[in-house]
Amino acid sequence: MSDFSFSPFESISGYILQPLNNVMNTTVSGLSSAISAPLNLASIIFIFLYGYNVMTGRVALSMNSLLNNVVKIVIVTTMATNADTFNTYVKNIFFGDLANAIGNALNSNPSSANVFDYILLKTSARYQEVLAAAWFLEKIMVGLLGSLMIMAVIVFCIGGFIVQMFAQVALVMIIGLGPLFISLYLFNATRKFTDAWITTLVNFTILQVLVIMLGTIMCKIILYVLDGTYESIYFLFPPVVVISIVGAILFRALPGIASALSSGGPYFNAGISSGGQIFTMLSSGAKTGRNAAKSAASTLSGAAGTATKAAKIGGNGRGRF
């Protein structure tokens, strides 16, 4: 498995993203065509009436203000009604170029595989090495601990992959509706919807970038652990499992961090809340186990008392015969 030819996450990503890309292109093209005629007509009427009022002195504005408004209208109309221009300046930048550039800058994998594929396959390869070096009877314990270790890494990779796919699917829906929300910028009453659309677009773009950054960081940490020299899997198992659990918690906190970054505020409660929820889950499990043990103990004590009474009754009965 050292050639990293098996890439499950990369394959699944390809199956998902290709239809999404087609849907986004179709949606952008359809919306641009649908709003082209009414938006161009409204822009022409607005420029004509606004310019007429400025030139006749009915509106106290300078020609510079008129030119600025005309330039804004031309830019918004071009972005909203021209699908090729929209794809060049919005779709390609936020959906592909930005994430790919950051991923290429951070990702130093010696293969072209997805970062989660690289982590999973590297862990599996190291597990095979430790299993091959174990003696015969130890292979059972090595196989058990190695399977648990790989399961922890799989949970970590699946968690990160789900967050990444969530960000990309959300970006497809947001970018697909871009021409409509951009056209709303022309009117003061609907400009707030365009501002909200831009904030949401930046939010999920940051989320996608954070997934790439965290995946790369955790990849380097896990690979640093795996590249060490271990005489037994007992020394390899704890750090890999702990790092995988911490990584899964951090992936769960990424949407909140991205939302805080897009709004300009710090976010320190995500990891604490996630850890608190896990602690609550574990404590609830412990309480459930304790209650089950108490119930079993009370049942056993009740059965023992019943057996004692039955023995006494049986003894009394034999005495009367």
From Swiss-Prot:
Induction: During the interaction with the intracellular environment of host cells. GO terms for cellular component: plasma membrane. The chain crosses the membrane at residues 30-50, 59-79, 142-162, 169-189, 206-226, 231-251. Pfam families: TrbL. InterPro entries: Conjugal_tfr_TrbL/VirB6. It is a multi-pass membrane protein. It is found in: Cell inner membrane. Belongs to the TrbL/VirB6 family. It comes from Bartonella henselae (strain ATCC 49882 / DSM 28221 / CCUG 30454 / Houston 1) (Rochalimaea henselae). One of its GO terms (biological process) is protein secretion by the type IV secretion system. The type IV secretion system VirB/VirD4 is a major virulence determinant for subversion of human endothelial cell (HEC) function. VirB-dependent changes of HEC include massive cytoskeletal rearrangements, a pro-inflammatory activation by nuclear factor NF-kappa-B, inhibition of early and late events of apoptosis, leading to an increased cell survival, and, at high infection doses, a cytostatic or cytotoxic effect, which interferes with a potent VirB-independent mitogenic activity. These changes of HEC require the T4S coupling protein VirD4 and at least one of the effector proteins BepA-G. This is Type IV secretion system protein VirB6. Its main location: membrane. Keywords: Cell inner membrane, Cell membrane, Membrane, Transmembrane, Transmembrane helix, Transport, Virulence.
